[in-house]
């Protein structure tokens, strides 16, 4: 119904962003909302998918069309809901997920919250040879140095984002220890490092 929404990114939360256009604020669930942080109070175009349930109508948003297409492919798999698909895309690019599927790398897929061996195998069976992602798109952010207080705030927000994805307290403690060893300059960077720590 909505291919994309273009407007001002007015708010950013661990699980979603709010885009305002024509006086309406659209709440959009995203894999990693902090990837949009550089667009806060600026115009942004988010590729969207509307999912209608009995109790809600939810908008899901993505940084590019490839990420959106991978999300739509994943939620067609038995046992994969929007939350699980978002968790996968929060820490992997569509290209990386496609490679895991094509190489039948079940172990890679089971590293995400809510994805067991049976579900990982189902993803491979259902999607191998059917995913059309052809190249990896990057969304590199310009890095700026931050002070210690800002870094602590960045780490706190990153941990909240990971908690929202379903990671446990034990896993978050592991991430926090890892992040304290890095000089992180943005929440998006901290989330990426945290996710790499969890899947390594």
Curated annotation (Swiss-Prot):
Gene3D superfamilies: 5' to 3' exonuclease, C-terminal subdomain, Nucleic acid-binding proteins. Residues 150-200 are annotated as: Domain III. Pfam families: HHH_5, RuvA_C, RuvA_N. Residues 64-142 are annotated as: Domain II. It is found in: Cytoplasm. One of its GO terms (cellular component) is Holliday junction helicase complex. One of its GO terms (biological process) is DNA repair. Residues 1-63 are annotated as: Domain I. One of its GO terms (molecular function) is four-way junction helicase activity. Keywords: Cytoplasm, DNA damage, DNA recombination, DNA repair, DNA-binding. Residues 143-149 are annotated as: Flexible linker. Belongs to the RuvA family. The RuvA-RuvB-RuvC complex processes Holliday junction (HJ) DNA during genetic recombination and DNA repair, while the RuvA-RuvB complex plays an important role in the rescue of blocked DNA replication forks via replication fork reversal (RFR). RuvA specifically binds to HJ cruciform DNA, conferring on it an open structure. The RuvB hexamer acts as an ATP-dependent pump, pulling dsDNA into and through the RuvAB complex. HJ branch migration allows RuvC to scan DNA until it finds its consensus sequence, where it cleaves and resolves the cruciform DNA. Has three domains with a flexible linker between the domains II and III and assumes an 'L' shape. Domain III is highly mobile and contacts RuvB. Homotetramer. Forms an RuvA(8)-RuvB(12)-Holliday junction (HJ) complex. HJ DNA is sandwiched between 2 RuvA tetramers; dsDNA enters through RuvA and exits via RuvB. An RuvB hexamer assembles on each DNA strand where it exits the tetramer. Each RuvB hexamer is contacted by two RuvA subunits (via domain III) on 2 adjacent RuvB subunits; this complex drives branch migration. In the full resolvosome a probable DNA-RuvA(4)-RuvB(12)-RuvC(2) complex forms which resolves the HJ. This is Holliday junction branch migration complex subunit RuvA. The gene is ruvA.
């Amino acid at each position: 119904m909505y291919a994309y929404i273009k407007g001002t990114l007015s708010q950013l939360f661990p699980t979603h962003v709010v885009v305002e256009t024509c006086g309406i604020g659209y709440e959009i669930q995203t894999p990693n909302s902090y990837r949009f942080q550089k667009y806060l109070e600026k115009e942004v175009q988010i590729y969207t998918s509307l999912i209608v349930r009995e109790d809600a109508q939810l908008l899901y948003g993505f940084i590019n069309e490839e990420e959106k297409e991978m999300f739509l492919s994943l939620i067609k798999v038995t046992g994969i809901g929007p939350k699980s698909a978002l968790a996968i895309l929060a820490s992997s690019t569509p290209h990386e997920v496609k490679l895991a599927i094509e190489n039948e790398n079940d172990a890679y897929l089971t590293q995400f919250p809510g994805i067991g061996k049976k579900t990982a195998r189902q993803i491979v069976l259902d999607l191998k040879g059917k995913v059309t992602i052809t190249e990896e798109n990057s969304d590199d952010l310009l890095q700026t140095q931050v002070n210690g207080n800002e870094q602590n705030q960045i780490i706190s927000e990153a941990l909240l984002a990971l908690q929202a994805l379903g990671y446990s307290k034990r896993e978050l403690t592991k991430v926090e220890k890892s992040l304290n060893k890095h000089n992180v300059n943005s929440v998006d960077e901290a989330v990426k490092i945290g996710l790499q720590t969890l899947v390594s």
